[in-house]
């Protein structure tokens, strides 16, 4: 049998593991697949999307991640996902959420930052875009 790549799991540094797990679970409705605080690690899953959370990150690691790395999550029916999570995003601090909008390159997206400022972009091809 030939080897196959079956997924990729970004490892996101977080300052407080419990806070981050709660955010991904309660705001984005990810399922907690692994919660190992003694190992400063958790994994959250929703459909095919997986994110590893690495707890105990220092300020330098958080700043480097926040300023240089983002996760792009491909979505089917962006509007349905937005309707699902928007009520839970209403209480987030200003600047943490950008509602759905159309990029000039033919993709619709919304943006969301986790408690440590890690940027997640949720997007799908705009069906109204001319080929």
Descriptions of predicted regions:
Residues 29-34, 95:
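Short secondary-structure junctions
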């Amino acid at each position: 049998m030939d080897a196959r790549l079956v997924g990729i799991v970004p490892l996101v540094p977080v300052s407080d593991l419990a806070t981050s797990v709660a955010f991904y679970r309660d705001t984005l409705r990810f399922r907690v697949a692994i919660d190992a605080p003694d190992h400063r690690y958790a994994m959250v899953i929703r459909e095919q999307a997986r994110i590893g959370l690495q707890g105990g990150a220092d300020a330098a690691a958080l700043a480097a991640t926040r300023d240089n790395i983002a996760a792009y999550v491909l979505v089917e029916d962006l509007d349905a996902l937005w309707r699902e999570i928007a009520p839970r995003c209403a209480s987030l601090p200003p600047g943490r959420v950008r509602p759905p909008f159309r990029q000039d390159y033919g993709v619709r997206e919304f943006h969301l930052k986790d408690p440590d400022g890690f940027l997640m972009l949720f997007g799908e091809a705009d069906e109204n875009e001319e080929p």
